[in-house]
């Protein structure tokens, strides 16, 4: 018999880190043509024999650090693994499919979405901000910008006061304070310093500063303190308008528009650009720590504090996984194929080490496991036009904004402990 052609059997050991699903650690002879479907049937039969529980569990199977997405024999051949050896297969309970929960209708394209607790903050091409509940109730429309809003982020939020920032094509960033009880909002500072539209914004982990990236190619850092006007050496020499905030730091290095910015820690920033590069900045040195060059414009990136990896979205329809700590060989760990147009937005889960979401100009969101490069776990459908932004800040909700003037809310059925903010 020829196991390599799918004829015959392969010796496997079935392992799991989820002890309540463990089966006896003995070699099992299985057909080389088995797929995830047949392996699930086989494994559930073993579990029924062990526990007597008739309920079926859906599992995914890791073979040499990658999810099985076809026949076992084909997977082993692709990785040049000998069929004579016993193969270790790790199985994990499949992450459940997020369910569509709501559609929040706006008056124009929704280009920015950020969730904190039960509140959804959105920014639109009609120059307005909006606040919604996670249950779809519209709370507030906030005018102020004079051009489309491109990015938003929360600074802080408690039962009484919410503070957040928004950036716009009008070249400004606005810092807002919202009284939750009275539902009154005011712009407490207008941040001026960029010379073109401000496409990206990110608040530091300690909520004391925020960073912005612009079409003027500049990265700027600002104070997020309630009463701090900021000001770097150059701008502090100019007289300040009342309520106007100036940057405390300006960093130059990109050659084209900065498309994304994210804090890695309180002294390190990640940026991506249309100039095909990704840069990691050391703010204590006020300079570039690492530069990664690619062959396409990068539209978005997300750094995970759980696995310390970066996933990027780019113009060639692909997502890529980078390890910025690698000094030798390729730092591209994987390429993820599945979208059919520009990938505009990407974000890691804040609680699930291997999961991230993406949104693209093919009108689709996708939920990925970084160990499954050949296919996403799920397609999250609903948008009728291109997806412009996606957010998974709250583990319970995946929210995306699009050119169909909607925010789509998907509920995750695996979200940990419920908090009072989510009720």
From Swiss-Prot:
The keyword Repeat applies. It comes from Drosophila willistoni. InterPro entries: G-protein_beta_WD-40_rep, NLE, WD40/YVTN_repeat-like_dom_sf, WD40_repeat_CS, WD40_repeat_dom_sf, WD40_rpt, WDR12/Ytm1. Pfam families: NLE, WD40. Belongs to the WD repeat WDR12/YTM1 family. Residues 10-93 are annotated as: Ubiquitin-like (UBL) domain. GO terms for molecular function: ribonucleoprotein complex binding. This is Ribosome biogenesis protein WDR12 homolog.
């Amino acid at each position: 018999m020829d196991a390599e052609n799918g004829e015959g059997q392969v010796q496997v050991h079935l392992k799991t880190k989820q002890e309540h699903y463990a089966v006896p650690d003995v070699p099992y002879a299985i057909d080389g043509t088995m797929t995830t479907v047949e392996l699930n049937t086989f494994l559930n039969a073993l579990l029924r024999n062990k526990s007597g529980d008739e309920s079926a569990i859906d599992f995914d199977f890791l073979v040499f650090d990658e999810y099985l997405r076809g026949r076992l024999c084909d997977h082993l051949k692709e990785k040049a693994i000998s069929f004579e050896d016993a193969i270790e297969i790790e199985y994990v309970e499949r992450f459940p499919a997020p369910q569509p929960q709501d559609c929040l209708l706006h008056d124009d394209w929704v280009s920015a979405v950020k969730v904190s607790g039960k509140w959804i903050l959105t920014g639109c091409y009609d120059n307005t901000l909006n606040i919604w509940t996670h249950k779809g109730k519209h709370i507030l429309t906030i005018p102020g910008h004079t051009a489309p809003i491109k990015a938003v982020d929360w600074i802080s939020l408690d039962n009484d006061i919410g503070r957040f920032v928004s950036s716009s094509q009008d070249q400004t960033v606005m810092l807002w304070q919202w009284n939750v009880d009275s539902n009154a909002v005011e712009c407490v500072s207008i941040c001026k310093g960029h010379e073109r539209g401000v496409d990206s914004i990110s608040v530091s982990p300690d909520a004391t500063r925020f960073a912005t990236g612009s079409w003027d190619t500049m990265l700027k850092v600002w104070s997020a303190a309630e009463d701090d006007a900021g000001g770097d050496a150059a701008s502090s020499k100019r007289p300040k308008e009342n309520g106007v905030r100036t940057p405390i730091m300006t960093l130059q290095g990109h050659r084209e528009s900065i498309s994304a910015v994210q804090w890695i820690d309180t002294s390190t920033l990640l940026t991506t650009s249309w100039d095909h590069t990704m840069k990691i900045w050391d703010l204590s040195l006020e300079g570039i720590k690492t530069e990664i060059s690619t062959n396409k414009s990068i539209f978005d990136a997300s750094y995970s504090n759980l696995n310390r990896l970066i996933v990027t979205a780019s113009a060639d329809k692909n997502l890529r996984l980078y390890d910025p700590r690698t000094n030798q060989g390729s730092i591209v760990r994987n390429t993820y194929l599945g979208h059919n147009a520009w990938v505009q937005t990407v974000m890691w889960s804040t609680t699930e080490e291997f999961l991230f979401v993406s949104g693209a100009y093919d009108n689709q969101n996708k939920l990925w496991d970084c160990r499954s490069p050949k296919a996403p776990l799920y397609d999250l459908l609903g948008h009728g036009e291109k997806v412009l932004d996606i957010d998974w800040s709250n583990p319970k909700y995946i929210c995306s904004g699009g050119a169909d003037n909607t925010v789509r809310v998907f509920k995750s059925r695996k979200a940990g402990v419920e908090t009072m903010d989510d009720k």
